Amino acid sequence: MKQWGASLAVMSMALLAACGGAASDGGTTPGTTAQLSVAVVGGGSVISQPAGIDCGVHCSAAVTLGTDIQLMATPSTGHVFSSWSGACSGTTPACSVAMNASRNVTASFVPASGASGWSNETALSAAGAGDPKVVIDAAGRALAVWTQLDSATTTNTSLWGSRYVPGSGWSAPQVLESNAGSISNIDLGMDRNSGRAVVVWRQLGTTYDGWAKPFDPGAGWGAATALESGGGAVDTGSVAVDGAGNATVVWSQIGPNTRFSIYASRYSFGGNWTSPVLIETNEVSGSQDGLPKVAALPGGGAVVVWKRSNGSEASLWTNAYNGSSWGSAAEVVADAGATQYIGSHALRMDATGNGMLVWGQLDTSNNALWYKRHAAGVWQGVAVQVAAPTPSVNQMSIPALAMNSAGTALTAWGIPDGTLFASTAAAGASFGTRASVRGASASLPTEVPVIGLDDQANAMAVWAESNGNLYLATRSAGNWGAPTPHENQTDVAAQPALDMNELGNAVLAWRQFVSGAGTKIYVRHYSSGR
């Protein structure tokens, strides 16, 4: 079992001992050592002779000046060694590094032709990182963003990011904004075909402000832009990117009537952001509108769903952008009175603009997931249960929802004993019989799984548990396999983020506690071989 306070094994001192570099007091003599740092890109590992480097676990060591260190690159299953860079060069797996100064070496691995499998887990960030978000495009290129402490002595966080390119691996992490306040409530959206993306976040200034930053595969990251200057605190936001690279961002913010209202802004690819627009007219004191979710439509439109609550009642509302203007807000799921309460919701659209809304709902002493479909710009009138309800006392699951471009949907949820369920629905059809992805046990999931779905309805689900482990379950040929641990670290793993493209390639990031250092963002990449 993992423990927060558990210590990692102390790295071998063989690199020093073999060269007589250890000082008599057990330390190192000042000026006699240099640092060897190794990075691994893709699926593989690197070891050294003398011992000390074993990367991806131990990727740096102090080495006596003047020593020649031999490095050996070994690909993981389904990968081949590609090349060295930095203080090593060439395409053969062995390399000798002359340590007459501190050196950096990178070993790159690429998927073997037609091979499938996961890359080794890799530490992507420095310490003090958390809240990762990931997306992957049709070509297998991925983005990861996360928050990271500015230093070990501050609580202020900044937004960082890295890009994955097949055959090249992850880029060096870079800070994505230069504002003074801490970052929270990140969302990351991408158009799979073009790879264009936008990240949005909340940042503490005089109050909480909303920010956004676009990404283009050819040009890289654009400028960070403040979305609003209304003075009221911003809460949560959501972003969707269409096939032209244009984006719709929606967020909740305290408006002129001192209540949370729903605002939107549009981004034109290569251009500017529009001024915020209030897209609902509730504005009743004591009633709050929040948790907006947005999905892009073909042709430049977008659909938004949010939750309206007064503390004892809740309903779901919607509005749509038609490519030139917003419509009128309308109730899509009504509150049925004191015996019902509506929880969190999820929204997805396919390539033709047909979509699905899924939400958790408590009715008397039962909880269940419900859904409505969106087709030809209209929401279906009657809500339908995903599966039979579960007896529960005041507990509802947050739903996870994925949809592929053809309209097949996958949803996942949990019940209080720790069981995780999933169900799929073909385009326009009802959900099938729920499947148990994970059974009840003493170690409980700490969150609802993150899920991905490809064009063949193969799927992945990843979650963290109270024992500190990260688990993966996969669906193939209509059946879920048994969950397996998906990281080999000693300490606690949490906050998984997963995305999967139509070909079944996937990217996974999570927050990993590292004893003696703090929390880092770790990543793995999956190649489907297609």
Regions found by a protein language model. Name each.
Residues 1-8:
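Bacterial N-terminal signal peptides that target proteins for export
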Residues 15-18:
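C-terminal motif of bacterial Sec signal peptides marking the signal peptidase cleavage site
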Residues 20-23:
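Bacterial signal peptide processing site
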Residues 30-39, 63, 94-113:
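Conserved "repeat-terminator" motif of extracellular CCP/Sushi domains
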Residues 37-56, 90, 123, 127, ...:
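Short, solvent-exposed loop/edge segments of extracellular or virion-exposed proteins
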Residues 41, 45, 67-93:
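Surface-exposed interfaces of beta-sheet-rich extracellular modules
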Residues 49-78, 99-101:
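Extracellular modular ligand-binding repeats in secreted and cell-surface proteins
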Residues 112-530:
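Extracellular, repeat-based ectodomains that mediate carbohydrate processing or recognition
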